[in-house]
């Protein structure tokens, strides 16, 4: 791991600098202690994403010799840049540091090397991880990082705001393209550690996380929020050069940023807080009712406190989405994109609104917005083999073709982004031996499928070397490369299940029944129809439908279901997790607790 601090020349006697150095040592120590997992479990940044944020890195050699993961932490006027390199080769390290020195950075600390040798029954894996905590003095450069330029300059034109908006999309890749969807399925019994395992994904099924291991989503989501805030401020102040740009164009860009900000806050409050319905029904107050800080201004010196869960929904997520829907044109699609369902359109906004209203327990609004998406006509359920083929790319995902995908995260080798899902989920001996096989489909989930269900027969696969186990084939990669998979965020099948549950709970939709919507999904997958609608049946169908798409943890939270597992052989103390429990709200990252006296940690940590 390479840890680099870029900062202005400051005397290290001041308290802030000492804090930064102390933080560097803390993170370094945490990494060494946690090196058994071979990764920091933090946000994965593509090199291209970091170069966009800090353009002076563009001349540095990009690492292509294995797996590279990047993370950063901004502190005042400094940037702590962490680069985790698996299978590091010495020529790259030499080239990296030579370029740093040539660019005017002065090395101020030392080098520590940690070597790890790991064996399993099939092969001997030798991993050499270089762990460095190095401080550099920054010399002013002629090419400034775009996010560090004057906002007035960078966002002074419509083209600049549009470019910044495109960057905000890429920020979302930082959590959906990483382990965000997979982590929560592994925690809640859909996945389990495979018989061959590289050491990854072992702490998640045991719920063995700490406040230093949950920074990924937090830092990535707030980075996206920061970018959206800057774009929205520029639009609202109207100080940019329009050059013939219409109000409609401006409104569409504003709607995109409102949606992306709402999505980031929605994911944050679902992960780091207890569910809205549980708090409301039990009259919970105090820290246990806390959500996440609402930050609307670009102020790195601010030390915000946490807003309540209700405030995050009612003062930000819902108003942002309502305004985004109002502003966006019915026919708008972002110009020049490679994947039209990886951008915000009006049905995308409406689909997220349906999900948000379900979590907020607004049953009629959840049903109404799910119906808007279903009636839109761009999306439809695919049956049998066509549904299976959708995952290998042989079915066009463009909405004109009637795809199931409403919104997804686009991942491409060409822009430096990547997804961890294919590597972790693909069975060993598949894709030229590239599959890690870290996570298999749990037997608990397999037992729920009917024998004819295409989600079992077409989207899971056995391996002759490991009888009795199945691996998912949902994320086979692009062009034979497992690290590049588009990641679905919203699908049409979810709209049917949302509407079914909302009607079951009292909503009304003319000509539609809850059982019809539930069975529309089940029978399209060649599964038996349900006789009745119950919350357990709805949960089971969602669990089968959205395997490794990150739904199960959030469904269990809002339904207030305890986790009960049979297929589990790790820490017996966390085999089953009751609800309620403090564990359903993950800890706020330790960095934010240390640097913000106004930030309260969740109970239990």
Regions found by a protein language model. Give the residues of each.
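Membrane-proximal, proline-rich intrinsically disordered regions
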Residues: 36-44, 137-183, 370, 449, ...
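TPR-repeat structural position
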Residues: 363, 509-511
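Elongated scaffold/linker segments in the mid-to-C-terminal portions of large proteins
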Residues: 372-375, 379-507, 517, 560-605
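Short, surface-exposed recognition loops and adjoining beta-strand edges that mediate ligand/DNA contacts
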Residues: 179-195, 273-288, 330-419
